[in-house]
Amino acid sequence: MQTSPLLTQLMEALRCLPGVGPKSAQRMAFTLLQRDRSGGMRLAQALTRAMSEIGHCADCRTFTEQDVCNICTNPRRQENGQICVVESPADIYAIEQTGQFSGRYFVLMGHLSPLDGIGPDDIGLDRLEQRLESETLTEVILATNPTVEGEATANYIGELCAQYGVSASRIAHGVPVGGELEMVDGTTLSHSLAGRHKLIF
C-alpha cells in the first residue's frame, strides 16, 4: 500500500519509542493527524526543545537543562552526606516518589558488563571516585538493579567506597508487598530470607 512519504516517516520515527511496533506507530500517527494536530505540534516542540536543551548534571549526571541539577544545588541535601547510586535517571524519579531519601544521587547510565565491553570509566566511576575523595560523605547507598550486572556493579562500588573509608549499603530487595510466595522466583525468595529482620514488640 502506498502512503504519504511524510506519514511513513512519522510512523517510522514513532517506532523509536520502547514497545511501539508498526501497528502502534500507525495508530499514534493517525490519531495525531485526525484528532489532535495541536497536541502533535506541542509534542514536536517539546521533543525539539528537550533533545537540544537537556544535558547532564555536572555532579550527579542526571538529566537537566542546567549545569547542576536542583537536587545537587539544594543545601539541605548537600548537608545530608548521603549519595544514592542508581543506574538511570528514571530510578531517581522512582526513589523521589517514596519521599524516603533526602540526599543526593549519582547516575551510572548503565552497569558494568565486561562481555559488552562496558568498564568502570564507561559508567562514570572515575567521577564517582572523585566525589568520594573530595566530599565529606557519611554513606553511599547502592540502588543498582537486582540483576547479575547490577550486583557486580554494586560490589565494585562498595570496594571503591571502602578504599576511601566511606560506608556503603545495598538497598534491600525481596518479596513485593501484596505478592504471594508461591509466585516469587527462587532468587528473590533467597534474598528475602537472607535479609529477614526480627520483630520487635
Curated annotation (Swiss-Prot):
Matches recorded under SMART domains: TOPRIM
InterPro entries cross-referenced by the UniProt entry: DNA_Rcmb_RecR, Rcmb_RecR, Rcmb_RecR_Znf, TOPRIM_dom, TOPRIM_RecR
An example Gene Ontology biological process: DNA repair
Keyword set includes DNA repair: yes
Domain Toprim: 81-176
Keywords attached to this entry: DNA damage, DNA recombination, DNA repair, Metal-binding, Zinc, Zinc-finger
Disulfide bonds: none
UniProt-listed HAMAP family: RecR
Family: Belongs to the RecR family.
Entry function: May play a role in DNA repair. It seems to be involved in an RecBC-independent recombinational process of DNA repair. It may act with RecF and RecO.
Protein name in UniProt: Recombination protein RecR
Origin species: Enterobacter sp. (strain 638)
Gene that encodes the chain: recR
